[in-house]
Amino acid sequence: MTIAEFVYTILLKPRPLRRAANAAIRALLPGRIRVGEATVWLNPDDPVISGALTLGVYERGEIAYFRSRFGADMTFVDIGANVGLYSALALSTPGFRGRVLAIEPHSESRVYLHKTIRSNAAPAGAGLISELAASDRPGTLTLYNNRENKGDNRLYPDSLLHGEETVGADSLDNICRRHGISTAQFIKIDVQGAEARVVRGASGLLGRSTECILMTEFWPYGLARCGSDGLEYLEMLQDLGFRLYELSHASGIPAPLANPRALVERTQGRRYANLVGLKGESVLKTVNSARQS
């Protein structure tokens, strides 16, 4: 649990305190912020993610890693894009000549995602948006919404979630095919426990992507609620050819994942980790040289 989570879930657990804190944060939020060269539009009704971005404490290690590894010629698939932070970082990369596909089924977040995509200088047509949920099959799903944290919408009910919407879904392979994407060099998956479903529906894309960096949240509780298992998810990624690393929340430095079972055991309940999967000789050379320097 991070310091921010401790403050929000423990110190501000009483509803009157939380309501007051949320109101104060909302009043201070700007319409948009700069993260390096990127412009990110904020949801003014999201005190958690928008507040953390405004204060500069949101996913600092993950942002540092992304910025250090993303290349201007890469195709990036951003699954669970929210308001488009990582898509903006990609599009604003100096000399960008790749493509970005931002996938976000939450209709409210997508309003700000569209603004973010439009606000970052990139070649016409470089930034694409899909309103479908990436899953393992076509259909419709119920997305349960968190009113206080718009990045915590899930595909299963929970006491923290109030309100729901029906969203279209399809496999990641099909979504990418519709947008003319056959391979990706960088993929981010942050979908509150539905990560295994995404990967099951992406065998074609991941198989063809021989040089690939994959950033993924690893939350065994969420995976279980979506019908999967933490160890199964790790093995699934390894079977697809990814070498796994755990990403430091503070520094963004990846450390080899030596004991998957131990990781599962220490990420129970609300605890989670951020992982990086690396595939391909040139990608692995990059991380090895970084660790040696």
Stretch-by-stretch model annotation:
Residues 1-293:
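Phosphate/nucleotide-binding beta-alpha loop and adjacent structural elements of enzyme active sites
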